[in-house]
Amino acid sequence: MAGGVPAMCDGITQGRVGMELSLMSRDVIAMSTAIALSHGVYDSAICLGICDKIIPGLFIGALSFGYLPVVFMPAGPMSSGLPNEEKANVRKAFAKGEVSREELIKAESKAYHGEGTCTFYGTANSNQIIMEIMGVHIPGAAFVHPNSDLRHAYNVLAVEQAVKINILSLIHI
């Protein structure tokens, strides 16, 4: 079973009313995680976290079920998109009428890079490191890119770890 959690990006909501919902969204994620795990039908769980709301929310929700083996898997860092200077140059050129709206939209679309944590070392990345330090991530997984062979290997390792922990918990019952 895969469960989804609502998420907001406070990087996008900066300076808007939605920014005030940042911590509330973390609590909603925690409750959603607890609800998903509350059915008592799981032998273990793997939580896939990415940002500074989702990771703590998943962790808080999982702590409600301390008897359930849970392994956290980080998303890893986003690949770099269009450099800021290039984006700024396209915006300036558009403002001067030197490039078309289509070229502006193309540059803006390249600004958002893809899956993974934000490309700056903010709280999303530090949350992944903290989870690794606490031992709930597979060691070394925090900064492996999402679409790499190594990421796939870490994902397989996370599943194997969840199964091993579950087997150990059954032995001690």
Identify the role of each PLM range.
Residues G49-S64, T117-H137:
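Conserved phosphate/anionic-ligand binding catalytic regions in large, soluble enzymes, centered on
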Residues M1-V70:
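Long, structured ligand/cofactor-binding scaffold of large enzymes
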Residues G4-M8, I50-K53, M73-E85, A142-F143:
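Short, ordered loop/turn segments at secondary-structure junctions
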Residues I171-I173:
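Conserved small/polar residues in nucleotide/adenosyl-binding loops
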Residues P56-H113:
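Glycine/threonine-rich beta-strand-loop-alpha-helix active-site module
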Residues G76, G135-A158:
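Terminal amphipathic helices with adjacent charged low-complexity linkers/tails
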Residues V28-A36, G57-G61, K106, K110, ...:
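Alpha-helical scaffold segments in soluble metabolic enzymes
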Residues P6-M19, E108-H113, H137-P146, Q161-I167:
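Gly-rich Lys/Arg/Thr-decorated short loops/hinges at beta-loop-alpha junctions or inter-strand turns
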